[in-house]
Amino acid sequence: MSDWNPSLYLHFSAERSRPAVELLARVPLENVEYVADLGCGPDNSTALLQQRWPAARITGIDSSPAMIAEARSALPDCQFVEADIRNWQPVQALDLIFANASLQWLPDHYELFPHLVSLLNPQGVLAVQMPDNWLEPTHVLMREVAWEQNYPDRGREPLAGVHAYYDILSEAGCEVDIWRTTYYHQMPSHQAIIDWVTATGLRPWLQDLTESEQQLFLKRYHQMLEEQYPLQENGQILLAFPRLFIVARRME
């Protein structure tokens, strides 16, 4: 599991794309020339940007070779760069930086967010959506299974929080719009929840395990999910998925 799996990631493409659609709807820009899609993945968010601003010069950034290859195949008119978001530098200042479900993987948001703002033109926008599910059972149970089976903690850190992001971006000279939404995704089974998180949140936990260790981890994780997520009357499972949204406009 050394690289991301685009096919597995896109298995829930509608659910993963919906927050990007809702984030994009809140971006207060009409004329956009230069756009960066940070953590672009296999193209789902970049395609939305291209649909809204077909004449814009859009660059997708991702550290995954597999994701970049998939995106290049799907959107040949856009530029895609394999790079670490923290180190990538645009050729020119940007009108929009769009980051859908990517920045939560990176540390030091107190430094990262002001750095991203510095890459914007005056009146440019940083639009961010991040899963805020560190305290949800899906992610708490990952840590509990790892503790039970004597594996090191490999999960991501919790987000800084609404008030912290507001202060970080306000101090960076931005007008900030910030909100939090909880989605309730209908899952047909507990295995479907595992399929969802295997493409994202579970990756760090599983990637260094042997195949047999992965099977033991997932078996125990499945058992715990059954205890935490009851079936609805129709047999479905409601998976609560909180997400944090930020639209910050550089006012300098």
UniProtKB/Swiss-Prot annotation:
Family annotation (InterPro entries): Methyltransf_25, SAM-dependent_MTases_sf, Trans-aconitate_MeTrfase, Trans_acon_MeTrfase_C
Localisation per UniProt entry: Cytoplasm
Q: What is this protein called?
A: Trans-aconitate 2-methyltransferase
Could you state a single Gene Ontology molecular function term? trans-aconitate 2-methyltransferase activity
Supply the alphabetized keyword list: Cytoplasm, Methyltransferase, S-adenosyl-L-methionine, Transferase
BP term (GO), one? methylation
Q: What is its EC number?
A: 2.1.1.144
The UniProt similarity line reads: Belongs to the methyltransferase superfamily. Tam family.
Which top class of enzyme applies to this chain?
transferase
Q: What does this protein do?
A: Catalyzes the S-adenosylmethionine monomethyl esterification of trans-aconitate.
**Catalytic reactions of this protein:** trans-aconitate + S-adenosyl-L-methionine = (E)-3-(methoxycarbonyl)pent-2-enedioate + S-adenosyl-L-homocysteine
Q: Which GO terms describe its cellular component?
A: cytoplasm
